[in-house]
Amino acid sequence: ATFFDPQPRLLAD
């Protein structure tokens, strides 16, 4: 995910 991804769960991707 990107830094501004609306879904925080994707930040761990």
Swiss-Prot record:
Post-translational modifications reported in the UniProt record: Glycosylated.
Coiled coil: none
Domain of life: Eukaryota
TM ranges: none
Tissue: Plasma.
Keyword field contains Glycoprotein: yes
Keyword annotations: Glycoprotein, Immunoglobulin domain, Secreted
Localization (cell): Secreted
Keyword Glycoprotein attached: yes
Complexes and interactors: Interacts with CRISP3.
Protein name as annotated: Alpha-1B-glycoprotein
Native source species: Oryctolagus cuniculus
Gene: A1BG
